[in-house]
């Protein structure tokens, strides 16, 4: 079967869309055209959260039942009008990552057309790439842990953090976990923000020893929810609000 192609105008940019009838979710019958339509529709909302942030993608070129891969670097075939930024050690050019950034509806459509189902972003945005503008507490439960209990725990953590004067938001990850996010002014480096997160989390975990832990190794926390503060390290990402998930 010949591959279908279609040109469309999104804002100032002409984008060639391909394989619009490719089934990405076999069990539900959702095709790539519907993924593109979703990201175009949600663009004004999601861009408020991710515009100016370096992005990583989980791509599913053959649908969610096929192989997937995590992409950080800007591909060679990316059009010049897609915003991008090189980050990393300037003394080690080979180790720097050329991240893509979402700037408008057209970039969202281009990402979706390349089966970028999941969007993940770092914790800083232009121009303060070295200074996070939020701290995240990632609640990661073990397999089979009741999701309502994770939600309840996240609101306990929110209340605890608010007791320390922070304004917090709770968001789902689209899978089994929950994020508690605390907005920050971009004034502090990643190390300072990580230390802050760990310092705040330690008393919370000590008061809930039977249900929570800061232990990162899964074999040492079989029945406990990890309060993952290590997500606040440089180059770590979290899934974007309103991102589709592959599973």
Q: Which residues does each PLM region occupy?
A:
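Broad gene-expression machinery/nucleic-acid interaction feature
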Residues: 5, 12, 114-116, 134-136, ...
């Amino acid at each position: 079967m010949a591959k279908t192609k279609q040109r469309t105008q999104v804002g100032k940019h002409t984008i060639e869309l391909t394989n619009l009838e490719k089934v990405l979710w076999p069990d539900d019958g959702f095709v790539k055209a519907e993924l593109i339509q979703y990201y175009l529709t949600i663009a004004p909302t999601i861009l408020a959260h991710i515009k100016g942030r370096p992005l990583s993608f989980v791509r599913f070129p053959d649908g969610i039942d096929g192989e997937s891969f995590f992409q950080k670097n800007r591909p060679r075939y990316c059009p010049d009008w897609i915003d991008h930024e090189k980050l990393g050690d300037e003394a080690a050019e080979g180790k720097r990552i050329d991240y893509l950034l979402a700037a408008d509806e057209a970039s969202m459509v281009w990402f979706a057309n390349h089966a970028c189902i999941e969007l993940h972003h770092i914790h800083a945005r232009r121009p303060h790439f070295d200074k996070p503008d939020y701290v995240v507490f990632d609640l990661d439960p073990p397999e089979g842990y009741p999701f309502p209990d994770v939600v309840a725990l996240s609101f306990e953590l929110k209340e605890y953090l608010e007791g320390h004067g922070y304004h917090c938001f709770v968001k789902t990850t689209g899978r089994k976990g929950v994020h508690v996010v605390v907005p920050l002014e971009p004034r502090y480096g990643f190390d300072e923000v990580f230390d802050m997160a760990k310092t705040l989390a330690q008393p919370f975990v000590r008061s809930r020893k039977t249900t929570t832990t800061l232990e990162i190794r899964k074999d040492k926390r079989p029945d406990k929810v990890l309060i993952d503060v290590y997500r606040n390290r440089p180059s770590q990402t979290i899934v974007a609000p309103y991102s589709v998930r592959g599973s």
